[in-house]
Swiss-Prot record:
UniProt keyword Hydrolase, yes or no: yes
Compartments where found: Nucleus, Nucleolus
Protein name per the record: ATP-dependent RNA helicase DHX33
PANTHER family (UniProt xref): ATP-DEPENDENT RNA HELICASE, ATP-DEPENDENT RNA HELICASE DHX33
Motif DEAH box, chain ranges: 188-191
Top-rank taxon, per record: Eukaryota
């Protein structure tokens, strides 16, 4: 690689990186220059790579299991768990903890009086690991081994090992605070520190205490990670930690020598350099920030592979992000033919829990998309931020799972030195509204809950205020959850969406709101195609509503539900089949919950009533047009514009709008907007004050 472009380092760094000269010139310069680098051992890299390995023709599953480092520690693990109710396990890359520890416990008889539950922060990890463990036990998924994620339950009465997302277990705890269906809870990937995981830490501690108090069978808890602060967790759980050796290979780390503005360009150049100079069995994993960025780059790579004259047709691109269907996510794990290189574009979903075989090269953009909560205005803002040093090492380590590898960082060493050491826990930076409602549903006051790290006071005050306005709680000396609030927690949704569904019947549009909430939960239904932009725009135009994006999305989803051949219909209309199929499944389950709550499933074509209903749930997301063409949000007075993807962008600007979320890039945008009126605000949500003047 051109020494003017990349430098070697044993440490990590962060930042974007394109250059001002042409793609070919940069590409050739990199392809014809030597790469000089040191090889730090990946044992230095603090990360989690769970052993999800594909069975090879030469190696049996049993041989693979015995080759994992955790296998030789199985007796030690069981001995520790027998002596203690809680065990902390810190294991290096590739130890086998995620797949093997549940099996050790099953064979030791821990599933005789309850299930072994293993939480994962992401649905794709829960599904993938469950399938692997079922395969290792020579069973069918849903029998001895199953999984439960939001809107999907693949378990049976025979299930002994159950993988589930932390959000699912948290919701179960509302109905069963003692978690009586479980004999063991394994809290995996503890370092991720999601809000749900942090809540579960306190809930399992409380369940253990109450079981002992009531002289019930002890609940065993195993907390596993590769990068957790063992002292912090040990003090919290009042137990010691055990460390397991991992299995890693050397990874050479490259940083750009200069800072660049466009890391996408850097990623492209680096990928085709790798493709030209390394064996085809060296698969590539590229870390990006989100679905739109991933799909856009995937198109560019495919186009460049077609037109390049250097034999780059032997390259296959896959994508991996949360919104993908299960089938599409699992495609990444299927080996490609011997002469075809696999390139996977992924979000941080690929940092931990799942390991994709064959990865020898990692390209790290150095950014991650995060939601942050502004306690002043009570709004979530979605923006790309720098990753932490711990994340950088986790990403680099993905190149050293099967053999020696290389990590190319699209940022300088100096940039990386400025990164935070570890990722800030979600509970300190995200909207705590759902968390507060969940705890109140458990009759737990946030001020009395045993947090590993307590949320910010300003955030809690904002959450209580928001829930009070939604009618979910009553605040005062002793805040408590209302009957409406208890109904709201029945839906696995943001409280705003739950409120929408619970009040839709009174507006006469329950069926429409079921569809709208479902499609909003799936996100990104429109497919962009740079080769056929005009055709895609024409196809999308027929769904557009002059009222805004929410009704446009409703038109799309209704068309999808009515189509006799959904796959062909989506192809012809440049729409995302995976997202719409997911939305259809979500709608089915939300409708079942609504029926269980005895809500009237009425329907209406009254556009005004539908928009008023949406306002009733999104009253915190109101913005008012100013004379300079910007919008000011009613909460927080944030200056913003309508997002370019909106049907209202570049057209008539309504005086008053509501929006789904704020997206922050170089500018601040309001995404998914609908026109409303000041009269509706006064009629539907008269308690909303401080509406900005025009």
């Amino acid at each position: 690689m051109d020494s003017k472009y990349f430098a070697t380092s044993r440490n990590d760094a962060v930042g974007p990186s394109p250059v001002k000269f042409s793609f070919k010139r940069k590409y050739d310069a990199m392809a014809n220059s030597p790469i000089l680098e040191k090889k730090p051992h990946v044992a230095q890299i603090k990360q989690t790579i769970a052993p999800i390995l594909l069975t090879s023709k030469r190696t049996s599953i049993e041989q693979q299991q015995k080759s994992l480092p955790v296998f030789n520690c199985r007796h030690r693990i069981l001995k520790e768990l027998e002596a203690n109710d809680t065990v902390l396990i810190m294991s290096e890359t590739g130890s086998g903890k995620t797949t093997q520890i549940p099996q050790f416990l099953l064979l030791a008889g821990y599933a005789k009086n309850g299930m072994i539950g293993i939480t994962q922060p992401r649905r794709v990890a829960a599904i993938t690991v469950a399938r692997r463990v079922a395969q290792e036990l020579n069973g069918t998924i849903g029998d001895t081994v199953g999984y439960t994620v939001r809107f999907e339950d693949v378990t049976s009465r025979a299930t002994k090992i159950r993988f589930l997302t932390d959000g699912v277990l948290l919701r179960e705890s509302i109905k069963d605070r003692l978690l009586l269906k479980y004999s063991v809870i394994i809290l995996d990937e503890a370092h991720e520190r999601t809000v749900n995981a942090d809540l579960l830490f306190g809930i399992v501690k409380d369940a253990q205490k109450e079981r002992r108090k009531q002289k019930l069978a002890n609940l065993k808890v195993v907390v596993t990670s590769a990068t957790m602060d063992i002292d912090h967790f040990g003090n919290y759980f009042n137990c010691k930690g055990m460390y397991l050796e991992g299995r890693t290979y050397p990874v050479r780390v490259m940083h750009t020598k200069e800072e660049h503005e466009d890391y996408i360009h850097t990623v492209l150049v680096t990928l085709f350099h790798i493709h030209r100079t390394t064996p085809k069995n060296h698969d590539v994993l590229i870390f990006l920030t989100g679905q739109e960025e991933i799909e856009s780059l995937a198109q560019q790579i495919r186009q460049l592979a077609k037109i390049d004259t250097t034999g780059t047709t032997d390259l296959r691109v896959f994508t991996l992000y949360a919104q993908l269907s299960q089938g599409k996510q699992l495609e990444c794990f299927v080996p490609t033919p011997a002469n075809v290189r696999k390139v996977i574009l992924a979000t941080n979903i690929a940092e931990t829990s799942i390991t994709i075989p064959g990865i020898r090269c990692v390209i790290d953009c150095g950014f991650v998309k995060e939601k942050s909560f502004n306690t002043v205005d009570g709004l979530d803002v979605l923006k790309s931020v720098r990753i932490s040093k711990a994340q950088a090492w986790q990403r680099a380590g993905r190149a050293g799972r099967d053999a020696d590898g290389t990590c190319y960082r699209a940022y300088t060493k100096a940039e990386m030195d400025s990164f935070a050491d570890a990722t800030q826990p979600e509970i300190l930076r995200t909207n705590p509204t759902s968390m507060v409602l969940q705890l109140l549903a458990l009759d737990i006051d946030c001020n009395n809950f045993d947090f590993l790290d307590p949320p910010l006071e300003d955030g809690l005050r904002s959450a209580y205020k928001s829930l009070d306005a939604l009618g979910a709680i009553k605040t005062g000396d002793d805040s408590y959850i209302t009957p409406l609030g208890r109904q709201m927690v029945q839906y696995p949704l943001d409280p705003k969406y739950s409120k929408l569904l619970l009040t839709a019947s009174s507006f006469g549009c329950m069926e429409e709101i079921l569809s709208l909430v479902s499609v909003l939960s799936s996100d990104h239904v429109f497919v962009s195609n740079s080769e056929k932009n005009e055709m895609a725009a024409l196809a999308h135009a027929k769904f557009q509503s002059k009222h805004g994006d929410h009704l446009t999305l409703l038109n799309v989803f209704n068309g999808f539900l009515k189509s006799e051949k959904p796959k062909m219909w989506c192809h012809d209309n440049y729409l995302n089949l995976r997202s719409l199929t997911y939305a259809r499944n979500v709608r089915r389950q939300l409708r079942e919950i609504s029926e269980h709550l005895h809500l009237a499933l009425n329907s209406s074509d009254d556009i005004e009533m539908l928009k008023k209903c949406i306002l009733n749930g999104f009253f915190e997301n109101i913005a008012v047009l100013q004379r300079d063409g910007f919008y000011i949000t009613a909460s927080g007075n944030i200056r913003s514009k309508i997002h370019p993807s909106s049907v209202l962008h570049g057209k008539y600007k309504p005086s008053y709008i509501l929006f789904t979320e704020i997206v922050q890039t170089e500018q601040t945008f309001l995404r998914q907007v609908t026109e409303i009126s000041i009269e509706w605000i006064k009629e539907v949500v008269p308690f909303v004050k401080n509406i900005p003047t025009r």
